[in-house]
Amino acid sequence: ASEMYADGFSKFRFGGYGEMAASYMDYDWNWVTPQGTSHMNRATVSIPRFILAFDYKFSPKWVLSSEIEFEYGGTGAAREVEWYEENGEYETEIEKGGEVALEQFHISYLMNKHLNFRFGHMIVPVGLTNAHHEPLNFFGVYRPEGETTLLPSTWHETGVALFGDLGNFDYELQVVSGLDPQGFRMENWVGKGTQGAFEETQFTHPAFVARVNYNGVKKFKGLRVGASFYYNQPSKNSSKPLRNQGEKYPLTIVTADAQYKSPNN
């Protein structure tokens, strides 16, 4: 909340950021298969994301915020080579080669620094990377692989939120759309479980989210310690409801993290 009050713009502002990445690998992309090899020199370049942001103040208390994300150049037909099944034949798949997504679109009512309200499409602050997903907030070229494999990233859902500051604590409480169990996989847990395959999002069983940060460690100015909590009953949000009819499997996520930024920067 303190960040929103300190933003300083009077009416509207534009912003954004982007990432360009280059990687070098000394192994084949399919090195774990019999056809692959663990010894191959190759390099890649990509534009993982480009974000455009816009904020508008209807009044000092009502603020509209939006972000549009372009991933890997936007949407298009992805082409793949069927190396084994079809002897290298090229196919045009009905897949998205990249993505254009409305990452944020919400209205905030700034009542005071302690209690504020938000309505719309917003970031789900579960885990360090989702809560602080801008490129300057992680050390590597890419976002931390462990967290972005197990959890959606960037995770954004539609709902309502309360947020504010209480002394050295800042908090956010959300009720947002839940996950689709059809996206759960053994190899990436709930990382692919966000809804979005259809125009409408199921809200039968919403998710409950809480995040708290503490910034009052006196011996280490610049240290922030945080924790987040997520609870959802995703069976009613299934994109294949007959398959999950009558099933109940609650999903609970608890995370803890810390981040240090030098006060001299």
Stretches found by the model and what they are:
Residues A1-S2, N265:
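Accessible peptide chain termini
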Residues E3-M25, M40-P181, T204-V209, N213-F220, ...:
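Outer membrane beta-barrel
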Residues N30-M40, G76-K96, D180-E199, S235-Y249:
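Solvent-exposed loop segments that connect transmembrane elements
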Residues S153, E199-A207, Q245-I253:
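Active-site glycine- and acidic-residue-rich loops that bind
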Residues F163-E200, R224-G226, K248-Y249, T255-Y260:
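Glycine/serine-rich loop-strand microenvironments at binding/catalytic pocket rims
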Residues W189-S238:
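Loop-centered beta-sheet repeat module
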Residues K218-N265:
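Detector for outer-membrane/organellar transmembrane beta-barrel domains
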